UniProtKB/Swiss-Prot annotation:
Cytoplasmic-facing ranges: 34-37, 90-92, 142-151, 391-406, 452-458, 503-655
Purpose: Forms an efflux pump with AaeA. Could function as a metabolic relief valve, allowing to eliminate certain compounds when they accumulate to high levels in the cell.
Ranges that cross the membrane: 13-33, 38-58, 69-89, 93-113, 121-141, 152-172, 370-390, 407-427, 431-451, 459-479, 482-502
UniProt similarity note: Belongs to the aromatic acid exporter ArAE (TC 2.A.85) family.
Subcellular location field: Cell inner membrane
Organism placement in taxonomy: Bacteria, Pseudomonadati, Pseudomonadota, Gammaproteobacteria, Enterobacterales
Record InterPro entries: PHBA_efflux_AaeB/fusaric-R (IPR006726), PHBA_efflux_pump_AaeB (IPR023706)
Pfam families in the record: FUSC (PF04632)
Keywords (A to Z) from UniProt: Cell inner membrane, Cell membrane, Membrane, Transmembrane, Transmembrane helix, Transport
Protein name: p-hydroxybenzoic acid efflux pump subunit AaeB
Length: 655
């Protein structure tokens, strides 16, 4: 396919984007809005953003959800701007500096919350800055300007959502159904690999792929939940299926590890059962029925605990999967599964990374302010706005430098493209609403094609072009103003890029160490006799951290194996029959405190000291278990955990 070719699957979204832009433009001028540009720009960004992220037409609900986040972020930003202006109207410089700090604060928050919701916080940061900069000459018009901006943005979002509904958005439900079947087959094949106890690299690749697919399925669940309220029952089942899929991975990998020391635990009967190849979910269903009969015949005590747990989890997976596909009423058996343990939310391990993002955004905005005041350039405020926009949106993504480069390419492409519209197209079409709408529709259509291909600069070009062409009411054509706006965008992106290059993010290794220590803390916290704590489901949170570790350190198998071993230890200790008495309960609390100290330690020396203390306490704990005559189901996992911590002590304590 050529670089400028148009694929059939890209046409529908390109028409949808063009329709959203035309609707916003028509409504903006029809109702005599002062700056219809904001409505058009909002419609374009809300519609094109999810398509750029997805690399194609977004699924149903994605545009609607992004629109809601933009409304929330805009309102938060407007309220913050009003508070800042009312409090500091007599000190304009201080007011702008506080806005720079506010933009940094919002970026810090957006780095810590879920990636789906971070857009609202990033938007609220630069919205406040835009309002404060715009009303510098007429501060008394702040409430009116904030209200107009909110109204125009809501209109733009409404147009994007309406265009999405008009062109029958894709439903993700069929993809979810197919992935559920495929995932169960892959889970069975992973257990086959683990029972064969073959090449460790092949097993690592298999479980790593399943972790990614399970995380992707959770993302599909979020999309399905946004799509329609009729998928509420499917959403509940998919939440439980996420935990079951992670449980299957854990039990398979534990089966592999057990065979390193005790291969005789896996009997020939089960080895023969798992030798049968499977291709479809029906094959898996037949095999599970055979296994359940074998387990009933041999007895639970004669069945390895990992296989027994795996078969039970796979059976529950099959039951819930059928419910998701049919979307029928939840049965009593399903309700019992769904009313399982409460899921514990993950605590962010990227606090240092978030602080780096705070300083990057704050410093770049302050640098833009100084540049504006020093040069007195009429479009210095435009440069400041672009700095805030780029840093607020770039910081929450894995590769901020590439986002900046995308914006730089986009603003450079917007200069000749905007020039064509400013000098030729708009002056010749402004007297006809039809021609004006058609000219903007052509722009939206062709950039919509490139956005779906994730062409570098396409998203930035769309936003930057709409921002600099004259879409105000009334239209005024001042070439110097156009040139200033276009150059201001380019300079702003350049300054943001320079700050990102200068303020280095060296938090990667620290984040990796914090993640590994959080796995250790989770394994230690599983040693408890507290009934409520034992019922907590930490598995989704632990695998979410493992997924982050895999993204931060691609290909680092030792880190992944260590993390997975800690997850297995957590699950095994959580189900272990620990003797219930006050002596052990007190010591459990002491172990948890020490593990928390390891995570929160501010220096390597403190961390090593607390880690050494944790190892000593684990040795004492093993002695206590011997005194209280704990069964092997307790003593063996604790011994394995202690051995792992001794082996990887340096990796867990050194920065």
């Amino acid at each position: 396919m050529g670089i400028f070719s148009i694929a059939n699957q890209h046409i529908r979204f390109a028409v949808k984007l063009a329709c959203a832009i035309v609707l916003a433009l028509f409504i903006g001028f029809h109702f005599q809005l002062e700056t219809p540009r904001w409505a058009v720009l909002t419609a374009a960004i809300v519609a094109a953003g999810p398509a750029f992220a997805a690399g194609g037409e977004p699924y149903s609900g994605a545009i609607r959800y992004r629109g809601m986040l933009r409304i929330i972020g805009t309102f938060i930003g407007c309220i913050a701007a009003l508070i800042i202006i009312i409090s500091m109207i007599r000190a304009p410089l201080l007011m702008i500096l506080v806005c720079c700090v506010w933009a940094g604060f919002c970026t810090w928050i957006s780095s810590l919350v879920r990636i789906e919701n971070s857009y609202a916080w990033g938007l609220s940061g630069y919205t406040a800055l835009i309002i404060v900069i715009t009303i510098q000459t007429e501060p008394l018009l702040t409430p009116q300007f904030a209200l107009e901006r909110c109204s125009e943005i809501v209109i733009g979002i409404g147009c994007a959502i309406l265009a999405d509904l008009l062109f029958s958005p894709r439903s993700i439900k069929q993809e979810v159904d197919r992935e559920l079947d495929s995932l169960l087959v892959a889970q069975y094949q992973l257990m086959q690999l683990c029972i064969k106890h073959g090449d460790s690299e092949e097993v690592d690749n298999a479980w790593g792929d399943l972790v990614r697919r399970t995380a992707a399925l959770e993302g599909m669940r979020s999309n399905l939940n946004m799509e329609s309220s009729r998928w509420v029952r499917a959403n509940r089942r998919l939440k439980a299926l996420n935990t079951l899929s992670l449980t299957l991975i854990t039990q398979s990998c534990e089966t592999y590890l057990i065979q390193n020391t005790r291969p005789e635990l896996i009997t020939d009967t089960f080895r023969e059962l798992f030798e049968t190849p499977v291709e479809t979910v029906q094959d898996v269903h037949r095999q599970l029925k055979r296994m359940r009969r074998v387990i009933v015949w041999t007895g639970e005590r004669e069945t390895p605990v990992t296989l027994y747990s795996w078969v039970g989890a796979a059976t529950r997976y099959l039951l819930l999967k059928r419910g998701v596909i049919s979307n029928t009423k939840i049965s009593a058996t399903e309700e019992e599964i769904l009313q399982g343990e409460p899921v514990v939310k993950v605590e962010s391990a990227e606090r240092h990374h978030a602080m780096v993002n705070f300083w990057r955004t704050t410093l770049s905005c302050i640098l833009g302010t100084l540049f504006w005041l020093w040069t007195g350039w009429t479009s210095g405020n435009g440069a400041m706005v672009m700095i805030a926009v780029v840093t607020s949106l770039a910081m929450r993504l894995p590769n901020p430098r590439m986002v900046c480069i995308d914006f730089i390419y986009g603003t450079l492409a917007a200069l000749p493209l905007g020039l064509l519209y400013f000098l030729v197209i708009i002056p010749n079409t402004q007297q006809s609403m039809l021609l004006l709408c058609l000219s903007l529709a052509v722009l939206g259509f062709f950039i919509g094609i490139e956005v779906q291909k994730r062409r570098l600069g396409s998203m930035g070009a769309l936003a930057s072009t709409i921002n600099i062409i004259v879409l105000d009411n009334p239209m005024t054509f001042h070439f110097s103003q156009f040139l200033d706006s276009a150059l201001g965008q380019i300079v702003g992106c350049m300054l943001a890029f320079i700050v990102i290059l200068l303020v280095r993010d060296k938090s990667k290794d620290r984040t990796g160490r914090v993640l590994l220590n959080q796995f250790v803390s989770a394994a230690v916290s599983a040693m408890t006799t507290n009934v409520v704590r034992r019922k907590e489901n930490r598995l989704p949170a632990l695998y979410q951290q493992l997924f982050l570790l895999m993204n931060k350190f691609p290909g680092d198998l030792p880190k992944f194996r260590l993390a997975l071993t800690m997850i297995i230890a957590h699950q095994r200790l959580r189900d272990a029959p620990i003797p219930v008495n006050e002596d052990l309960s007190v010591f459990h609390r002491q172990l948890r405190r020490t593990a928390d100290h390891v995570i929160s330690a501010g220096s390597d020396d403190k961390r090593r000291r607390y880690f050494g203390q944790l190892l000593d306490e684990l040795d004492i704990y093993q002695e206590k278990l011997r005194i209280w005559e704990a069964p092997p189901q307790v003593t063996e996992p604790v011994k394995r955990l202690t051995g792992m911590l001794h082996k990887y002590q340096n990796a867990l304590t050194d920065s």
